[in-house]
């Protein structure tokens, strides 16, 4: 199954493969709501034999308790590469850093401080050894918050305003971005990159998850279909999570009608525009209206199945590349 993979993503991936040296650091940002689905085998290959930090962003929308977060940390330790570090961020922590001038280190959220310290550790040794330039490439799928993380780090480190464009829609960054200094007096720079999707969906449910968390542009899937999946997940968790919009139901048409009534969004003659109200419900989900929960299964068996699918995809791509070279 194909996914949203416009030309600039393919170009970006090729440029990254040509640009990232063994001394550089990869910061991969993932959406904590889909910690498994937002893994990208193409980025895994890019990070092989390089220092890498995996940042789970938007944790406030995913984890109601610290226990769930610890479980993600533990599962993430099943890495195929030598140096992988895990950090977690919430939306409010990056926003908090950007909204005020960080005059002292005590004003910086703890997670940002930890991430800065980790990047210092990973970059300073190589820099000191040869005074070479070290780049920190910030990568990940669309709309996981790469630019926000990058801006928060730079603002906390150098007390400067944001340098990367931030948007609420996937695909805001379309080219390998401007190289900006990360630490004062050091040749350590961050590079913003466009979000890169998988050219092929590994599991059918992934496409709906991507649409739900806005990793894909709205309209790629019908909004009502995405809300139908959301309703299914909410019913599994607790139907009381949406009682402000509707009484408990398994029928998405009934849910959308009730939501339109409760929010005053009925059209003329009491009609319901399913697409319009579905779009509104999706916006509510993306702001945490229904609470914090993870869309991916957190069971280790599911992680192992995912890793197997990723390996098969990588092998197919490698065979395709070899076949193309032989024909050339």
Curated annotation (Swiss-Prot):
Where is this protein localized, as stated in its record? Answer: Mitochondrion inner membrane
| Originating species | Schizosaccharomyces japonicus (strain yFS275 / FY16936) (Fission yeast)
A single cellular component GO annotation: mitochondrion
* Membrane protein topology class: Peripheral membrane protein
CP-type G domain sequence ranges: 10-199
Gene Ontology biological process terms, A to Z: mitochondrial translation
Write the record's keywords in alphabetical order, separated by commas. Answer: GTP-binding, Membrane, Mitochondrion, Mitochondrion inner membrane, Nucleotide-binding, Transit peptide
Q: Which family does it belong to?
A: Belongs to the TRAFAC class YlqF/YawG GTPase family. MTG1 subfamily.
Q: Which CDD domains match?
A: YlqF
Q: What does this protein do?
A: Mitochondrial GTPase involved in assembly of the large ribosomal subunit. Plays a role in expression of the mitochondrial translational machinery.
The protein in question is named Mitochondrial GTPase 1
Q: Name one GO molecular function term.
A: GTPase activity
Amino acids binding GTP: 57-60, 143-148, 195
